[in-house]
Amino acid sequence: MKKTYLYVIISTFLFSSMEISLKMAGGSFSGIQLNFLRFLVGGIALLPFALHALSREHQRIHLKDMGLFAFTGLIAVVVSMSFYQVAVEVDKASTVAVVFSANPIFALIFSYLILKETLSRSNLIAVIVSIVGLLIIVNPTHLTDPLGLSLSIIAALTFGLYSIISRWGSMRHHFNGLTMTSFTFIFGAIELAILMGISHIQSIATGLLQNPKLSEFANIPYFSGITSSNAFLLLYICLGVTAGGFGFYFLAMETSNVSTASLVFFIKPALAPILALLILHEKITLSTWLGIIVIVIGSMIMFIGDRFANQDNPMPHAHH
């Protein structure tokens, strides 16, 4: 059990530094390029572990599995993470971190809608409390920049959807979480690479360049911009945050259960703004602090509720 908590702590720190490191790298790379690099390298870094898990289970990847990975890659990497990346660029890292941490709440709602899983009373309360916390941070009445916030919410929503489809896929195809993640990242990166290629087609690039808001999506570079000064940060994002964060998260899940592993997303809303304050010197308003506290309370309700549910019902949980 001690090992599990070590995995949770490492994963939480890696994930909590995600928005900050992405913000720091944002100056040297295009957002979509950064997304492409981190999922390509992260996915490849997780691949040996995924292949090891497959050979241990005597499994092979079939064509129909590729369809699943292409779909999860599209939702997680192309849609969710692109919105997320642009959100980090236009908004405060701390705000994006907190809003994105609400993705397990959206996942709960989707699991109810798609997998027809029942929402326990504690989970329902957690959803409501967390949404209240989000509203306090977001404070819709004082919205100066609705763009960053809308993008963060879309990213969290679609990531919640991805985790449910991923869970459904791993249950149906019997892949473990790490295998699912590695192939999702690689397929998502390939899909992004295709879209990036399209952005180099002259007529399309010209059209995008004419709109100042869309000009950054024209001629998206693949590898240019990598220098000796930012290579370490880029490696940290690819291997630390993307491969390491997810890797340790799944290790925690495999040595314990889903609710313990998901502690990662519960500690993050509190830790990420503190790191943003220390590293990026972002000002954190009183309402943000209040919202963070409420979200953490909501997460605690969900975590404690899951704990009790596990004690009453010792059935093993499906992986996220």
Language-model-detected regions and their locations in the chain:
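Specific transmembrane alpha-helical segments of multi-pass solute transporters/efflux pumps
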Residues: 14-19, 54-94, 100, 136, ...
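Glycine-/small-residue-enriched transmembrane alpha-helix faces in small-molecule transporters
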Residues: 1-36, 143-168, 190-194, 312-320
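Transmembrane alpha-helices of multi-pass small-molecule transport proteins
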Residues: 28-79, 106-107, 158-165, 182-203, ...
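C-terminal-most transmembrane helix of multi-pass membrane proteins
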Residues: 39, 230, 262, 266-320
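Loop-to-transmembrane-helix transition segments
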Residues: 3-11, 58-83, 147-155, 207-244
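Specific alpha-helical transmembrane segments that line the substrate/conduction pathway
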Residues: 33-44, 84-118, 123-124, 155, ...
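Helix-helix packing/entry segments at the starts of transmembrane helices
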Residues: 37, 93-102, 166-189, 238-278
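Hydrophobic transmembrane alpha-helices of multi-pass small-molecule transport proteins
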Residues: 46, 110, 119-139, 156-159, ...
